[in-house]
């Protein structure tokens, strides 16, 4: 048996990532030098740490149930071991002695019962069936115990379940798929994974059910040749014309690809993993945020860094453009900076969160900035004020992400009300009327942390994805659940295509699913 600290650290790091502890994973990864290890993350299956712990727990339970003579204790376990019990020698020894005592009692009771049965049971009378054996009516004695079992999954009306005929599952990734995004002008779906690849899937009508995939391998130069980086693809974004795809990776490089899968540029100035990147609307600049505490504006045509902004005191987690040359960034330092190309200091700084700021989004007009944090609050900011306009407190766990609806002034749906959606580790999604500063709907069907929300292009529906493996589609006006799909892995990201008739979702088991919502 061989166990190295690097291997243990890698499995712990992957567990933190898979469980949604992205900031803890980052800190642990830096302190344990994960990026310097030679372990190929693409070869490790999802939930590897949990799997090996479960096997170890089963071994301890088996060890407890072995008698001194090497035979197995013949009976059901008194109770299964908890993980904490299994690592405590006193508990294991006590449990072993309990098994031995139980065995002695059973042997004594069996001998007494046999003697009594021989004296009292007529020859034509059968003894009652043991628990688990079939009785005359074909049911198991003790079947009532099964009837009392219940599932932890929330009941979903069968009328809203999306049939398998309306779901296409795309397989090819060899590790978790953290992100996905539709091309804004065609039915091409991009996905990014822990297997150090991004993929472009063709879901158009003339494609063979998504079988067409382009593999974008993220490589680095070593020894004069290109080798796989073995690092997660953490972010991706299409330009507004749908001709180019930008990706950010844990290897510290941003890359620009054509929609045909060809590498156009490699952008290398960050000194560590990239957590977020965005095209501006014009398509001439790309904005990235990194663990090195900086944000960078890149010239998309030349691949050169136009300006690096070193204003955060801790890793930058998210960025969003306000205009073609002005943007906001947030960080684990609890601050939000608004910066402009050509300015050597932030033009505005918002402070008020008391924990890491996970995500920021400008509303469609660029007037209001929403932010969400591990402090469980959602805040709305305006460039006209130094303090937040609204401090929305309703979630009881960390808020992971937020999205504005594509409605109201400045959108294609100007007559519909503007809304904001928030997704939290408390397993709920909330819809907010920002003008009034109130929550108008609380969406509660999920059973695990919710990692992603996305509005349909007309704003009438909201998709949500959770680690409970479910994608739910909600009516934004009524808060009613209208569609539901259960996948095969925890959902990290959901997104709508431009036509508003398909939803893409990326999952922890390496799958990407596409839900066809056309009737």
From Swiss-Prot:
* LisH domain segment(s): 4-36
Cellular location of this protein? Nucleus
Source domain of life: Eukaryota
Is Transcription regulation set as a keyword in this record?
Answer: yes
- F-box-like domain residues: 41-86
What InterPro entries does the database record attribute to this sequence? Ebi-like, G-protein_beta_WD-40_rep, LisH, WD40/YVTN_repeat-like_dom_sf, WD40_repeat_CS, WD40_repeat_dom_sf, WD40_rpt
UniProt entry tagged with the keyword Secreted? no
What's one GO MF term for it? transcription corepressor activity
Write out the GO cellular component annotations: histone deacetylase complex
Which keywords accompany this UniProt record? Activator, Chromatin regulator, Nucleus, Repeat, Repressor, Transcription, Transcription regulation, Ubl conjugation pathway, WD repeat
* Location of the region described as Disordered in the Swiss-Prot/TrEMBL record: 115-147
UniProt repeat feature WD, residue ranges: 172-211, 228-267, 269-308, 311-349, 352-391, 394-442, 445-484, 486-519
The biological process GO terms on file are: chromatin organization; regulation of transcription by RNA polymerase II
Q: Mark out the compositionally biased spans (Low complexity).
A: 115-139
Q: Which family does it belong to?
A: Belongs to the WD repeat EBI family.
Q: What's said on domains? A: The F-box-like domain is related to the F-box domain, and also functions to recruit ubiquitin E3 ligase complexes.
Subunit note: Interacts with heterodimers of rxra and thrb, and this interaction is abrogated by thyroid hormone binding to thrb. Interacts with ncor1.
Query: What does it do?
Result: F-box-like protein which acts as an integral component of the N-CoR transcriptional corepressor complex. Probably regulates transcription activation mediated by nuclear receptors. May mediate the recruitment of the 19S proteasome complex, leading to the subsequent proteasomal degradation of the N-CoR complex, thereby allowing cofactor exchange and transcription activation.
Protein name listed in UniProt: F-box-like/WD repeat-containing protein TBL1XR1-A
> Source organism lineage?
Eukaryota, Metazoa, Chordata, Craniata, Vertebrata
């Amino acid at each position: 048996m061989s166990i190295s600290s690097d291997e243990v650290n890698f499995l712990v790091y992957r567990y933190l990532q898979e469980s949604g502890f992205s900031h803890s994973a980052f800190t642990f990864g830096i302190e344990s030098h994960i990026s310097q290890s030679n372990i190929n993350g693409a070869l490790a299956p999802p939930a590897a740490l949990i799997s090996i712990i479960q096997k170890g727990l089963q071994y301890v339970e088996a060890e407890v149930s072995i008698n001194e003579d090497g035979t197995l204790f013949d009976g059901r376990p008194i109770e299964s071991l908890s993980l904490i019990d299994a690592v405590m020698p006193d508990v294991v020894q006590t449990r072993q002695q309990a098994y031995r005592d139980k065995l002695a009692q059973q042997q004594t009771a069996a001998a007494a019962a046999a003697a009594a049965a021989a004296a009292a049971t007529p020859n034509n009378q059968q003894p009652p069936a043991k628990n688990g054996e079939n009785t005359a009516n074909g049911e198991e004695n003790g079947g009532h115990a099964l009837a009392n079992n219940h599932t932890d999954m929330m009941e979903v009306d069968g009328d809203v379940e999306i049939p398998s005929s309306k779901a296409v599952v795309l397989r090819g990734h060899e590790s978790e798929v953290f992100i996905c995004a539709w091309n804004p002008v065609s039915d091409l779906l991009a996905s990014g994974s822990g297997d150090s690849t991004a993929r472009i899937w063709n879901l158009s009508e003339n494609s063979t059910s998504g079988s067409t995939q382009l593999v974008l391998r993220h490589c680095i130069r070593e020894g004069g040749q290109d080798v796989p980086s073995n690092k997660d693809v953490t972010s991706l974004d299409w330009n507004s014309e749908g001709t180019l795809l930008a990706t950010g990776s844990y290897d510290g490089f941003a890359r620009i690809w054509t929609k045909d899968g060809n590498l156009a540029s490699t952008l290398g100035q960050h000194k560590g993993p990239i957590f977020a990147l965005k095209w501006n609307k014009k398509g001439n600049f790309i904005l990235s945020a990194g663990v090195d505490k900086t944000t960078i504006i890149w010239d998309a045509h030349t691949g050169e860094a136009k300006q690096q902004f070193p204003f955060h005191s801790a890793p930058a987690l998210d960025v969003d453009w306000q205009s073609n040359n002005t943007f906001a960034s947030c960080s684990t330092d609890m601050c939000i900076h608004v910066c402009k190309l050509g300015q050597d200091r932030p033009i505005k700084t918002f402070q008020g969160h008391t924990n890491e700021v996970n995500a920021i989004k400008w509303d469609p007009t660029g007037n209001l900035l929403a932010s969400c944090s591990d402090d469980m609050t959602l805040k709305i900011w305006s460039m006209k004020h130094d303090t937040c306009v609204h401090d929305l407190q309703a979630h009881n766990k960390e808020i992971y992400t937020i999205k504005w609806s594509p409605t109201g002034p400045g959108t294609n749906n100007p007559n519909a009300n503007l809304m904001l959606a928030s997704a939290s580790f408390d397993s709920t999604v909330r819809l907010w009327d920002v003008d009034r500063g109130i929550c108008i709907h609380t969406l509660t069907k999920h059973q695990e942390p919710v990692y992603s929300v996305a509005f349909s292009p007309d704003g009438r529906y909201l998709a949500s994805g959770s680690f409970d493996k479910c994608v739910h589609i909600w009516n934004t006006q009524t808060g009613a659940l209208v569609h539901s799909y259960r996948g095969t892995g925890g959902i990290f990201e959901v997104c709508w295509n431009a036509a508003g008739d398909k939803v893409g979702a990326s999952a922890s088991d390496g799958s990407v699913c596409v839900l066809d919502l056309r009737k």
